[in-house]
Every structure is written in C-alpha cells, then in structure tokens.
Amino acid sequence: MGFVGDFCDDVARSIGFLSRIPMPARHFEGYDGRLSRAVRAFPFAGLAIALPSAAVAMALMALQVSSLFAAFVVVAIQALVTGALHEDGLGDTADGFGGGRDREAALAIMKDSRIGTYAAVALILSFGLRVSAFASILPLFSPLGAAMAILGAACLSRAAMVWHWSSLPPARSSGVAASAGEPEPAATRFALAFGLLVAMLLFYLAQVPALGVIAALVAFLATVKGFARLAMRKIGGQTGDTIGATQQLTEIAVLGALALTV
C-alpha cells in the first residue's frame, strides 16, 4: 500500500482513537492497536473532530446568535464528539498532580475513575475558559473565519499531544499510552510540521492579525514545554491522561492568546 493508503488508514485510526466518530472497518484490518506511525495523522484527525463544531459555529454566527450561546454549543459539541476523552485526561491529571504526595501516589490517583476536588476545579476552569475565549473571538471574525479559527486551534492542540507523547518516557509500563507504543520520530516530525503549517494557514485565512498568530504560537510552545516539565517532575513521564491534558491545556492557551490579541 502506498503513502496515500497508509495515511488514510492512519487518519481513520487516529479519529477512531480520539473520538466517537465511527470509521470504516477496512482501515483496521490487521491492526494491532499501536499508534507509533498513526500519530502523524493526529492534527488531521483534530480537524475532522472539530469540523462539526466549526460548522455549527459558522451557522450560528451567520444567524447572529449570541456569541456566548454559540460558544457553549461549540464546546458541548466538541465534548460529545470526543466522548469527553481529553477532559477525562485533564481531570485525572489534576487529581493526581494535585493530590499525590509522590510519584506512586499520583499515578494511583490518576487510575482512580472517581472525580476529586482538583479534577472538578480543573474541568470547571477548562469549560469556562474555553467558552469565554470562544465568546470573545467568534464575533470578531466572519462566520467562515470563526470556523477556521476553531479548526486551527483544534489542529494545533492535537499536534501538541504528539509532541508531549514523544518527548517524555512512559510513566508506567501499562496503560493506554504504553500499549499504543512510542511515536516514531518521523511521524512526530510530520505531525508537528503539518499541525503548525495548517493551523497557520487557517489563522491566515481567518484573518487573524500577525500579533495573534505569534501569540498563539508562543502559547502553544510554552504550554507544551511547561506541562511536559511538570509531568516529568510529578510522575517521571507521560501517560494517556497527561496526553489528553496536553490537548486541553494547549487549546485553552491558544484560544486565550487569540482572545487577548485579536
């Protein structure tokens, strides 16, 4: 199978892994569940996953609906499409990092499915910050531009997941991230290049000012690097939860940067 066929398989597997969107079974024939190569398609999968919310946002803004209502709808659709996968990772990470006395305690807490105080606060802040950021920026763009801004942030945040995953060792020998394998260096480079280039193109087409683009890039870089350092200090590496938390934190940072500068 050539590059196009392999990439289509990787896109389908990435979308299937990151969301509740059903994918054709033919893309999973002989698939062992590892994502070492498939992570190169994470940014593209982010575009597909965010497309429903972007389309609804475009329609609502064209109808001149309240930007706050539109922002709530956008975030709600994103959570439904992903099954709140990334929010779950953020909540578990917040509980583990906040309540764990040491590495072992933090990892044990992160495996607990119950929601603690730190998780509740983190999720409230995540939804609140994203809704407020969307409410701030959506009316500043044309309806199509608003959709492109949503897609750009989604693309960047999925590239951030690959960067975090590839830059840290597994914090535990079992779990989703460990069983899915370590991202291949070539796949990581492709994901970062694709994610950055496509996000910048979408921001350009949305007519985001140069200051906004620079601020979004700085927010992207600072969040991924800063959170990776925190994860390394707290648990000695990455897990599926910290990968999901990276998506949430990066999207919040990028949207916040746009809200402050557009």
Swiss-Prot record:
GO cellular component, one term: plasma membrane
EC number from the UniProt entry: 2.7.8.26
GO function terms (MF aspect): adenosylcobinamide-GDP ribazoletransferase activity; cobalamin 5'-phosphate synthase activity
Subunit structure: Associated with a large complex of proteins.
Catalysed reaction, written as an equation: alpha-ribazole + adenosylcob(III)inamide-GDP = adenosylcob(III)alamin + GMP + H(+); alpha-ribazole 5'-phosphate + adenosylcob(III)inamide-GDP = adenosylcob(III)alamin 5'-phosphate + GMP + H(+)
First-listed, main subcellular location of the protein, grouped into a coarse class: membrane
Name the record gives this protein: Adenosylcobinamide-GDP ribazoletransferase
Keywords for the protein's UniProt record, in alphabetical order: Cell inner membrane, Cell membrane, Cobalamin biosynthesis, Magnesium, Membrane, Transferase, Transmembrane, Transmembrane helix
Membrane topology note: Multi-pass membrane protein
Catalytic EC class: transferase
Name of the gene this protein is made from: cobV
Compartment(s): Cell inner membrane
Pathway(s): Cofactor biosynthesis; adenosylcobalamin biosynthesis; adenosylcobalamin from cob(II)yrinate a,c-diamide: step 7/7
Family of the protein in this entry: Belongs to the CobS family.
Cofactors: Mg(2+)
GO biological process, one term: cobalamin biosynthetic process
One Pfam assignment: CobS
PANTHER family documented for this protein: ADENOSYLCOBINAMIDE-GDP RIBAZOLETRANSFERASE
Transmembrane segments: 41-63, 68-85, 115-134, 141-163, 201-221
Record function comment: Joins adenosylcobinamide-GDP and alpha-ribazole to generate adenosylcobalamin (Ado-cobalamin). Also synthesizes adenosylcobalamin 5'-phosphate from adenosylcobinamide-GDP and alpha-ribazole 5'-phosphate.
